Every structure is written in structure tokens, then in C-alpha cells.
Design a protein with these regions (language model features):
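Binding-site signature for planar aromatic cofactors or substrates
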Residues: 1-188
Length: 188
């Protein structure tokens, strides 16, 4: 059954690298706020060390993860085996958002894939790793990645993406600020 570790082991990193899908969960401090759970793919995440992961975060209609990280930093990642031996792997930690133009952008961007529509990088320091059986996770065949988001971003172009982010990504659904919103406020 489940085991707990204080770092990402080599076998955990290898398992993570094989998964075409992961989930990231965050929540605001307000008990009435909305918990967020987002599926992510596109081979966007990398294990950077035994206690750090990062992923490229694409432009989307919401920016809940970033707002929650700005408020409290709490983050959980989950990876599931949909084929092969059953396994669920969770990474618990504290995350932050890095925007293009931030001092440490290049240090992280150079270690991650370049994807059209990238709006920010999410970096997390991991302090707990937990495995569980995964016996109830169904078998599923991976077909291929969806290209829709990359195609949309390429068609829209960077200037239009910036405008879109300023319209859609500055506040959470619970009206929390995001780093994009804070940066925009400092500019104006």
C-alpha cells in the first residue's frame, strides 16, 4: 500500500517522466473559496531535483493555480499509472509562479520545453512524496496529445495572447489576484 518519502526518488522521477498526464491541485485560504484541480499534459513538467519540480503553464481561460500559489503557496501534484503496474504518486509542496521577465525566468525556462502560448512557469519545492496502490485507477490507452491549445496560441499571436491574459488571467474566480494581475497593476 502507500509509502511516504521526504524527497523524489529516482524511480519516482522515472514514473513521472512516463506519464502523459498529471493533475495539479491548489486551494485558497478562505473556506468558502473554490478548490482547483487542473489536468496538465503536453510533456510540460520536469523533475529538476529530488525536491523541486517545474512546469510550463499555458495560457488558458483561468489562472486559479497561480492565484492560490500567490496567496498561500500550497500545491499538490498527482500522477496515475493508466497502464502497467498500478500506482498513484502525489507530490506535496510549496509553489510559486515565475513570469517572463522575472529575474529567474531563464534559469527555469532553459530546463523546460518551449511551447506556444506559455504564460508562466510554476515551480514547486517538494517536501512530501506519497505513493498509493492505484488499484481502482482504470487501464486506458494513450492515443496522442491534443494540439488544440498550441494551435490556438500560434494562431492568436503573442500580442493578442498578452491582451487575452490581461482580460482573463488577472483574478481568480474567488477574486484573488494573480501574479499577472499584480504585474499589470505595477505597470499601470
Amino acid at each position: 500500500m502507500g509509502k511516504v518519502f521526504d524527497h523524489i526518488r529516482e524511480e519516482d522521477a522515472a514514473f513521472i517522466a512516463r506519464q502523459p498526464l498529471f493533475f495539479v491541485a491548489t486551494a485558497p485560504l478562505d473556506a468558502d473559496g473554490h478548490v482547483n484541480l487542473s489536468p496538465k499534459g503536453m510533456d510540460a513538467l520536469r523533475v529538476l531535483s529530488a525536491d523541486e519540480v517545474a512546469y510550463v503553464d499555458m495560457t488558458g481561460s483561468g489562472n486559479e493555480t497561480s492565484a492560490h500559489l500567490l496567496e498561500n503557496g500550497r500545491v499538490t501534484f498527482m500522477f496515475c499509472a493508466f497502464n502497467g503496474a498500478p500506482n498513484i504518486l502525489r507530490l506535496f509542496g510549496t509553489g510559486r509562479t515565475i513570469l517572463p521577465g522575472d529575474a529567474d525566468w531563464s534559469a527555469y525556462a532553459d530546463r523546460l520545453p518551449t511551447l506556444p502560448g506559455t504564460r508562466q512557469i510554476i515551480v514547486a519545492s517538494i517536501d512530501r512524496v506519497q505513493t498509493s496502490c492505484g488499484f481502482a485507477v482504470p487501464y486506458m490507452d494513450y492515443v496522442k496529445p491534443r494540439e488544440t491549445l498550441c494551435d490556438w496560441a500560434e494562431k492568436k499571436g503573442e500580442d493578442a495572447l498578452v491582451t487575452y491574459r490581461h482580460e482573463k488571467n488577472v483574478r481568480s474566480i474567488d477574486d484573488l489576484p494573480t501574479p499577472i494581475g499584480e504585474a499589470l497593476a505595477q505597470e499601470g
